[in-house]
Amino acid sequence: MVFDLLERLFNRNKTGSATVAKDRLKMVLAVDRTEIAPQTIEQIRKEILDVIVRYFEIDENEKFDVTLERERGSTAIIANVPIRRIRPEHI
């Protein structure tokens, strides 16, 4: 993608408000291209979290994030979940 190329060219650090804005823009574009309503994305996020907490203890102080990424004509749902450990009953 163009953003990735620019990032490689300028070798920017991935911190700060510019990165947050870029990530939000990517999410908006991906949602727009896949025609998924923001409410649907939020529902997907809640359902993913419901399943994950059945099997893992998560770190509630860390950010749980679900994003859509579009690359080479396909879209992927990416979940970033801060997991502390597997629940003992599933070991």
UniProtKB/Swiss-Prot annotation:
Prevents the cell division inhibition by proteins MinC and MinD at internal division sites while permitting inhibition at polar sites. This ensures cell division at the proper site by restricting the formation of a division septum at the midpoint of the long axis of the cell. GO terms for cellular component: plasma membrane. GO terms for biological process: division septum site selection; regulation of division septum assembly. This is Cell division topological specificity factor. Keywords: Cell cycle, Cell division. InterPro entries: MinE (IPR005527), MinE_sf (IPR036707). Gene3D superfamilies: Cell division topological specificity factor MinE (3.30.1070.10). Belongs to the MinE family. It comes from the Bacteria. NCBIfam families: minE. Pfam families: MinE (PF03776).
